[in-house]
């Protein structure tokens, strides 16, 4: 693909990258042939396994949506595949798909789309998801159901998809905004992290003929996604990371595999004095050789035209008539904690299952006051699908609504989240399993029959209108007015609340003050959204530092109980409301919820 050099590469990679670009074929003598004369814009080429066809994203006119097209390798017989489902980008061929309900397998393709206009977990814009369809454009199916961008799909030799995915928002500050490599089956099942080590942002993966996973990485996400080149081994992706290029080598984009174990990649200098040209890179030595460069254009997304082995076919258990999926865990105590003694058996009492609701709602039509979300508070609403006991051996087995973004939180005796995960999901009829809670992905578990799978799955599939939410305006503020104001209405109070704090402005000011930053970068003075156990407000409510040994806030120092002995003590339900509110993101306003539905002790799960 070539793109005129005077164009500025835009940050909106999905809609603006490739605007006005053209597809060209470069011959060995460096002569070129344009293949996309009938298109205003064409980009994202993908070569078929037999090298006879090419998929690409194109726009006939500037006002068109991006759609997926296929043509013969010589540019003839152009046909549109997607139509009327929004902007579609980044196509790639899949291998054969087999199902138990179809007498014949079929070929599919993967693409990226914002067809459903689902907002991300910041509420900032539509989320890009992976989709699949047959080569004739029928049987369009969504594959990813998290609330963050998914992009750059690449088909691996075993038939799974490798792609880049952004970690969920601010409930885990260490991962917030990172883009890592993930793997998934071509039917959307078994979503799992593939490679994380290296720099913060990893994009544009490909795999060489010798089993080297190549990707672009950077610590600062540039407007075009460019960076250095890193790699990991296909056979040990979690433990074999190494950098191939260094910063002084320039900026790189869109690596693709060659038949001789090398890669094609676009490169330019970091000072913006030139345009991208296409180079051959030897991953073992880092040696670069210029292949093609048109000085007036950015030359990117180069793909060599040669036949290659077709990936393994895949089967699928997904049955769309089944509205639910299952999720089981063998042992929540298998984890990545540095010291296993930090979480002895018996620490985890229950499991809370949260649903991510991508659309932003507000009770009674009220609006969230401008500026109240401080950049670390997630915008997406969370609803409680259920809360259940964990088996004595650390296992659980639940049935959840299919194709629904969920977050798991393991809870201690006080109902505080100890560990949590990013957005995951189960497809229709999928029996999804996990070994532990952030376990080592290279290790296999002990071969034991865990207790939870000897019983039917616990159903956590209440109708949406019966799923409980917790928010500040409706649930927390009434407790503050009832139990806290008697001490905090004094002029010398550290956190002062006026006696007449009843207007929306008063309530908004209290909420904003609870989210105020601490004295050090990243610190919070009162609450950490998503982590009740490390929030000083919770320490005072429980009269002790509730942090755990793996938290940097862990301390045995005495904490003053609030309300004090002479005050009106909070009930267990009132304490639990504060805990749930913070663990679920400390949102200002929630989804409308009649009488908050059920009590804190019954969250939709059935317990044996």
Language model: regions and residue ranges:
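Alpha-helix boundary/interfacial micro-motifs
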Residues: 61, 101-102, 163, 176, ...
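Sequence signature of WD/YWTD-type beta-propeller architectures
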Residues: 1-393, 399, 418-433, 444
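Aromatic- and Gly/Pro-enriched helix-to-coil junctions and flexible linker segments
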Residues: 1, 18, 341, 346-348, ...
